[in-house]
Amino acid sequence: MFLDYNPTQGKVAGDHAYKTQQPLPPLNRWVQSYWQLTVPKGLFHYHSVPDNCVDWIINLDCFDDNFFIPPFLSSTVFHIDGPASFFGIRFRILGHQGLISVPLGEWGEVGSVKAEDLLPADIVYSVYEVIYNAKSFDKRCNSLSAVILSAVTFADVDPRLARYIRYCYENVSSNLDLSDSQSSKFGLSARQLRRLTKQHVGLLPKDFGKVLRFQSVLRAMSALQSNKVYLDHYYDQSHFVREFKRLSGVTPTQFKKMSVLYNHYSSK
C-alpha cells in the first residue's frame, strides 16, 4: 500500500549537517527518504521523535555499525562521539516488508537489530559496496536506489490492516474510534486489530494513531506561523501540550526552537 506520508524529525542547526532526498517512483512506494547526518567533533546528542517508520541506519565510518530501528512511542536520544557521519534509509509505513520477511513484531521489541540478522547477505554486501564506493550523498542515494529496487518485492499486506491504516491516515485530525463496532468495518475485532498492528506495525492501534496525529502537527508547526495548530487535532491546548511532551520529550515551544542535534555540554 502507498500513503503520501512524509514525517519530520525536526531541524538540525548547520547548513550541511542534515541532508534528505526522496527516491523517485517506483521505489518511493517502499522508501520514504534517504538522510545523512554529519556530526562535528565533540560529544553530541541526537533527539529523535516518533514517526511510525522503520529506519536502516549506517555508520559511514564503520559499516559493521549498521542496524534497523523499529517504530517507537517516545523520544529517543542517541549519544554520538563526533566526528561521525550516518546515512539512513527511512521506509514508508509497512515499506520495510519489501526487504524484511521477518514480521516486525518478532524483532521490534529489541530496540535495534543488525541488518545482517534480518536481510540476505547479498543485499547487505551490495549496500556495503555502495557506501564504500560512493563519496557523495547524491551518489549514495542514486546507487542505493538501484540496489534496493532490484531486491525489493511486493509484500502481501493483510487488507484488514491496510483498511485500518488508511482510516487512521484519513482521520488524523479526529478522535479515532477503535471500538469493536469500528474495527468490524475493517473486518476484525478490536482484539484482533491490536494483535495485527503490533505484529506488522510495531505499535498498538491507539499509539500508531497518536504518532500520526503528532507528525501531522509537526508538519503544520513547520509550515505555519500560528501558535494554534493544535486546534485541528486536539481538544484544547493543555491536551495538546501534554501529549506532545509525552511523545517528543519537550514542549512544542522548546521543539520549535531547538536543534535536534546538540552538544552534550550545551542546552537544547
Spell out what each predicted region is:
Residues 180-181, 196:
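Conserved binding-pocket/active-site segment within a compact domain
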Residues 1-180, 186-190, 204, 225-235, ...:
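Alpha-helical bundle regulatory/interaction domains
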Residues 31, 240, 244:
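Conserved active-site tyrosine of GNAT-family acetyltransferases
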